[in-house]
A protein has these predicted regions:
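Glycine-rich beta-strand-to-loop/alpha-helix junction loops that act as flexible
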Residues: 191-192, 226-233, 272-276
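Conserved radical SAM core fold
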Residues: 60, 81-83, 103-106, 144-161, ...
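Metal-dependent enolase-superfamily TIM-barrel catalytic cores that perform enediolate-based chemistry
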Residues: 124-127, 160-178, 200-212
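Non-cysteine beta-strand/loop elements that form the S-adenosyl-L-methionine
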Residues: 77-80, 98-101, 137-153, 184-189, ...
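Short glycine/threonine-rich loop-to-helix capping motif typified by GTGT followed
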Residues: 197-204, 235-248, 279-291
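Charged (often Lys/Glu-rich) extended helix/loop segments that serve as interaction or gating elements
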Residues: 257-261, 265-325
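A charged N-terminal "starter" segment
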Residues: 1-117, 122-136, 177-179, 183, ...
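Glycine-rich tight-turn/loop motif centered on a GG-T
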Residues: 21-23, 92-93, 111-116, 152-165, ...
C-alpha cells in the first residue's frame, strides 16, 4: 500500500508535545488556505460563487476564522453553530441555515442574524411565518427520490432520506413563498456523502439546473442561486486517488452552459457546502503509544480514545495511521 505522508515531521511533533500534551488535533493552516483558494479557482467562471463551510464538520472557531479570511461563508444546521458563527463575525448572507424539524428559537435566531434560510419541508413555511417572518431571500431543499447513480454505481438512495421536498412540493412552496413576498429563491440538494468521483457535482448540477429552468417557467420566480451542498469527499486509504476539484468545477461549468445559459439564467450563483473536502486532508490526531498487550492478537495502546476520534468505534470507519517514532 502506498504511504500517506503527514504534513508534520517527527521533529516538529517532538517540539510541539513539549507544550501541548497528547492527544491533540493539529491542522495545516497553509494547506487549508491553499485548498480554499483552489476551490474558488475551480468555480471562478461563476461570478457569484461562494463556499459555505459545513460547520458541523469541524466546529472550531479558529478554523472558521481562517476560512472566513479566505472568503468562505458558513453552513449551519443548529443553534450552537449559528451562535458560534455569529461570535466569529459571520452575518447576513455569509450564513446558510439548513436544518430539519427546526425549533422556533432556531428560526428566530437565524432571522435575527439575517441568515439565508434553507427550508427542508413545505410545512415549515407556515411555521416560519408564525414564529418569525418570511424573508425576501429564501432557499428550498429538493429531494428527487428514487436512487442516485453515477454510471452503473449506486451512490445513495434519496428516496429513503428524510431531507427535502418532492418535485410537486417545491413548486407549490415557491408559489406560496412568492405570494408571501419572497423576491429571490435558491435551490439546494444533497444526494450522496463522501463521493470520491469527479462526476458527482456535475451530475447533481444537471438535475438542479434543469429543475431551476422548469420552476422558473412554472412559477415565474427569480432563482438567484443553486446550492450543490456537500458530498465531494476524500479518499481515506492511501491507494485511492483524490478528487480533482478543477475537473469538478469544469464539469459543473459545462452543465451550466448547457442548461442555464440558453434559458437566460446565466446570472445564477453557484454555492457549495463542503466540509470534509475542505479540512479532512489537513488535520491529524496526534497520540502517543503507551502500552503493549499480547493476547490472541497484538495490541498497541495509545493515549487517545473514542472521544478523540469517534468514527472507527461507531461504524468501523478507516483512518490511516502513520507511526512517526
Amino acid at each position: 500500500m502506498p504511504k500517506k505522508i503527514p504534513f508534520v515531521t517527527k521533529s516538529q511533533i517532538e517540539q510541539i508535545v513539549k507544550e501541548y500534551p497528547t492527544p491533540f488535533h493539529i491542522y495545516d493552516e497553509k494547506g487549508i488556505r491553499e485548498n480554499a483558494r483552489k476551490l474558488k479557482q475551480a468555480f471562478s467562471w461563476n461570478k457569484g460563487f461562494k463556499e459555505y463551510f459545513a460547520v458541523k464538520a469541524t466546529p472550531n472557531p479558529h478554523i472558521l476564522k481562517v476560512l472566513q479570511e479566505e472568503g468562505c461563508g458558513v453552513d449551519c444546521s443548529s443553534l450552537t453553530e449559528l451562535m458560534m458563527s455569529d461570535k466569529c463575525g459571520f452575518k447576513n448572507d455569509d450564513i446558510m441555515f439548513s436544518s430539519n424539524d427546526t425549533p422556533a428559537n432556531e428560526f428566530q435566531y437565524a432571522r435575527k442574524l439575517n441568515a439565508t434560510i434553507n427550508l427542508d419541508d413545505i410545512t415549515h413555511i407556515d411555521f416560519l411565518k408564525e414564529v418569525a417572518d418570511i424573508p425576501e431571500v429564501i432557499s428550498c431543499r429538493f429531494n428527487p427520490g428514487g436512487v442516485f447513480s453515477l454510471g452503473t454505481d449506486i451512490m445513495d438512495n434519496p428516496g429513503d432520506a428524510k431531507y427535502g421536498m418532492t418535485r410537486e412540493q417545491i413548486a407549490e412552496a415557491f408559489k406560496k413563498l412568492k405570494e408571501l413576498g419572497v423576491k429571490e429563491f435558491g435551490i439546494h440538494s444533497f444526494l450522496a456523502s463522501n463521493t470520491v468521483s469527479n462526476e458527482y457535482y456535475p451530475e447533481l448540477a444537471k438535475i438542479l439546473f434543469k429543475l431551476a429552468v422548469e420552476l422558473k417557467e412554472e412559477t415565474g420566480v427569480h432563482i438567484g442561486f443553486i446550492n450543490l451542498s456537500g458530498g465531494v469527499g476524500i479518499p481515506y486509504t492511501p491507494d485511492k486517488e483524490p478528487n480533482d476539484i478543477m475537473v469538478i468545477g469544469e464539469g459543473v461549468r459545462k452543465a451550466f452552459e448547457e442548461v442555464l445559459v440558453p434559458a437566460g439564467m446565466g446570472d445564477v450563483a453557484i454555492y457549495t457546502e463542503l466540509g470534509r473536502f475542505m479540512l479532512a486532508p489537513y488535520g491529524h490526531l496526534v497520540t502517543k503509544a503507551i502500552h503493549e498487550k499480547h493476547i490472541y492478537k497484538e495490541y498497541i495502546g495509545v493515549d487517545a480514545c473514542a472521544v478523540n476520534l469517534m468514527r472507527p468505534a461507531m461504524y468501523g470507519a478507516y483512518h490511516h495511521i502513520t507511526v512517526l517514532g
